[in-house]
Amino acid sequence: MSRLLLRCLLLCCLALVAGCPKSASKGTALEELQYAYSAAVRWGDFEGAWNLVDPKVRQEQPLTDIDFSRYKQVQISGYRDLGGTTLGNGEVVRDIEIGVVNRHTLAERTVRYRERWRYDEAAKTWWLVGGLPDLWDER
């Protein structure tokens, strides 16, 4: 039930962002989407977070049910914004530190992740370019 409520809340946030007047700045829209994305990740709603990924990326690198089931094996214990910057091409990057707990072993670890966002003029929205965080990268 709480997952359904979280998804509805995320969709409402997206609808509000989409319905914002055109006078709203791109920066404000980006902050709102980043907040919605971070909330989805913090609450383990990776399917909801996937909806904020660039449609081109979703088409070229689709996630399977098995991929989503891997995300259900972990719990997010923290999501910290370490800072960001705007690149020359208009993209915005944000460094994130994510606390990850394995639900089976209860072992906690920290993963660093770089979000990359681009503004889509046609859709009048920001999209996450890099996909969902790889919580299993053993580098």
Predicted features and spans:
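Short solvent-exposed beta->alpha transition segments
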Residues: 31-32, 46-93, 106
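C-terminal motif of bacterial Sec signal peptides marking the signal peptidase cleavage site
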Residues: 16-19
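Exposed beta-sheet edge and beta->alpha loop/turn motif
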Residues: 87-139
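Bacterial N-terminal signal peptides that target proteins for export
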Residues: 1-9
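Sec-exported extracytoplasmic/periplasmic mature domains
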Residues: 38-42, 46, 51-58, 99-102, ...
